[in-house]
């Protein structure tokens, strides 16, 4: 704060030991003149010519103060102009905030993301191919196991038929053995019969001719042949029946196997298609999840980047606003100081004019003789009563006013 009140210019002087100093030398101040003594030029302190010296000193002091105030006003004006030029230059030179160019990095990131997505799709395609190969291997393994089961069933059926054929062969052998035994028995019976007939003939000779009406003999060969034919027909019939049954069972089993194989093939094909569809959907779902994650990460990074940029811009705006506020405050303060200085200058010029008018209007002159009884105005001055210029009582020091009247309103 500036206190532009003038210092107390009242001369706090005690009466000197010079002879005949009047007792009316108490310091008084001019009203509204910042404690400028009013008895300057009227009280004969230092005889004739002291008024001119005090006036010169006062005027010199006031001129120096006025020159210093004017110099300070000019300095403040220069500082204000310099600040205004700096503000203008700063506002002209300040470039808008340019965000760094990350387009090349973004393009590189996009290319890398595309490569990653291509690699992921290629990996997914390879995984699908591997799964398809595994499914095809499973299908071939299932077919192999099915064919192996069918082969085992056919082999078991063939073994069963072979056992039946062996049993039939054994039965045929038994029947052939029985036929041979019956043939041998028939031969034995025939030979025994012929022997008996020959024996009887030899005993009876020709004496007896017996004619016996008997049933015609049975042809055993024919009977055996018929029996053989019947058994062979029966065996052939049984064999044909068994073969027909086997063929029917085999055809039915083949039909069932074919239908089951077709159903199994269709089911396996459908399962393979469904698995492929599921794998493709899983791959697509994984790709969508990855895309969503990448987009979320990109969104998060973008939000973070733009929030950081926004914070930087806000901080820059805050700094600029604070600088502008400080500059405005400085400008207002300097304007106020400048205004105060202008007011002080005007007040000082007014006071100087007042002092000059007072000094010019002073028509009383100091006497040349310090012990004169009259002054230039013809007024009587009381002579010194004391003996050879004894020192008078000390003058009461000038009590300064509590405040300067004209300058009080400018004290900050």
From Swiss-Prot:
PANTHER family listed in its UniProt record: INTERMEDIATE FILAMENT, KERATIN, TYPE I CUTICULAR HA1
A single BP term in Gene Ontology: intermediate filament organization
Record SMART domains: Filament (SM01391)
GO molecular function terms attached to this record: structural molecule activity
Listed name of the protein: Keratin, type I microfibrillar 48 kDa, component 8C-1
Domain IF rod: 55-366
Region Linker 1, residue ranges: 91-101
Disulfide topology: none
GO annotations of cellular component type: intermediate filament
Organism per entry: Ovis aries (Sheep)
Entry-linked Pfam families: Filament
Region (Coil 1B): 102-202
């Amino acid at each position: 704060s500036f206190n532009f009140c003038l210092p107390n210019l009242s001369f706090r002087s005690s009466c000197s030991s010079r002879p005949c100093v009047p007792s009316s030398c108490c310091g008084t101040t001019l009203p509204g003149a910042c404690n400028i003594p009013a008895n300057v030029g009227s009280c004969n302190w230092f005889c004739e010519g002291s008024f001119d010296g005090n006036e010169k000193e006062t005027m010199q002091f006031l001129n120096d103060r006025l020159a210093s105030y004017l110099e300070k006003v000019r300095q403040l004006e220069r500082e204000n102009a310099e600040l205004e030029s700096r503000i203008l230059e700063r506002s002209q030179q300040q470039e808008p905030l340019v965000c760094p160019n990350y387009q090349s990095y973004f393009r590189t990131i996009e290319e890398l993301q595309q490569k990653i997505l291509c690699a992921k799709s290629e990996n997914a395609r390879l995984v699908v191919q591997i799964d398809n190969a595994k499914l095809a291997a499973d299908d071939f393994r299932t077919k192999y196991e099915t064919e192996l089961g069918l082969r085992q069933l056919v082999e078991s059926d063939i073994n069963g038929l072979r056992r039946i054929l062996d049993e039939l062969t054994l039965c045929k052998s038994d029947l052939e053995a029985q036929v041979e035994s019956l043939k041998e028995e028939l031969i034995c019976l025939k030979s025994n019969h012929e022997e008996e007939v020959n024996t009887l003939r030899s005993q009876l000779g020709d004496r007896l001719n017996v004619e016996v009406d008997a049933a015609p003999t049975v042809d055993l060969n024919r009977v055996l042949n018929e029996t053989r034919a019947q058994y062979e027909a029966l065996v052939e019939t049984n064999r044909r029946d068994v073969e027909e049954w086997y063929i029917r069972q085999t055809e039915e089993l083949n039909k069932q196997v074919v239908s089951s194989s077709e159903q199994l093939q269709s089911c396996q094909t459908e399962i393979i298609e469904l698995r492929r569809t599921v794998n493709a959907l899983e791959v697509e779902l994984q790709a969508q999840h990855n895309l969503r994650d990448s987009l979320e990460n990109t969104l998060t990074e973008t939000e973070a980047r733009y929030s950081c940029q926004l914070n930087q811009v806000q901080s820059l705006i805050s700094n600029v606003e604070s600088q502008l506020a400080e500059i405005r405050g400085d400008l207002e303060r300097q304007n106020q100081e400048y205004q105060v200085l202008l007011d002080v200058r005007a007040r000082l010029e007014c006071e100087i004019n007042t002092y000059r008018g007072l000094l010019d209007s002073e028509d009383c002159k100091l006497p040349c003789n310090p012990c004169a009884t009259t002054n230039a105005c013809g007024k009587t001055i009381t002579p010194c009563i004391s003996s050879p210029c004894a020192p008078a009582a000390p003058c009461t020091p000038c009590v300064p006013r509590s405040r300067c009247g004209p300058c009080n309103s400018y004290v900050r």
